[in-house]
């Protein structure tokens, strides 16, 4: 099975845009028992790509992409487990062609498209320049390293220049195919600038794209790519890339991760082997005494999750996370579920950013898993405004 998976990943690296997904199918998976959930998640190591993790606990129907080589085997496994299934997408290649038209933003930055990295940088520079003479707000575009392909790793720092406030960090684009997280982060920039009360008690660090190389690759080559583009492994030129959110130094390479460079869950050669994870680590080291809240924006389907992910237990801040998370869910309209990360989907995940930061002293850390994957252009603003309402209520709770 591993050999087949390696071959398929090699093929993915050489085909034209979208063509590598010909014959791939996406299944809706409806789980009824905890045993089904436990066993189903173990299939990820065999090349099944979960677009949305199923949750028996919350009645969340999962979406799993299956290559043609795995289809019979996968369906046999589902039958063995008694999992209800239906074909959601018959051919991923055709699906991507049909949905591509609304992916790219036009010449203006209006939250009605998904923008390329260079345009995002230009937009951030424009905002920085617009406020360079302001006396009541300080906006800095800070570069802190470069990717393997030479792109700058940047963040926005927004604050009141006369104060030394606590810090909120918003991180997006750690999984490069989760495009909706990027406008969600940039929307936070706009909201904080417009609503200055959020600068009374906080400096805001906003990273719109943690993984620029992977993000660009999803635009130009493989839409469903999940890693960066590093070639440090022994198969780097054949199977490049590391899953950034498996590369942090907490329970590294143990759960929901892989030692195979050709896996979409590959955790790297060692913790912090990648410039993107070192970038976040350096931010933590710089602001560690001031970080009040850390939020990782992801896109696996309508959850707010808090530590731990690496073990089936809560952190010492369980009660505080639950109370604040409940307020966030309510502010977002009640459409999101709230739980400990490892319990929400019945599986653990090693090497994640929020677990690492919690282990190293950050009191409040959440994943906001934005609802819906392929949000159409006309719906982007509605979706990201809902995310902002959750972030805003969390920040306001500390200002009271």
Mark where each language-model region is:
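Classical eukaryotic N-terminal signal peptides for Sec-dependent ER targeting/secretion
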Residues: 1-8
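M14 metallocarboxypeptidase catalytic domain recognition
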Residues: 2, 13-400
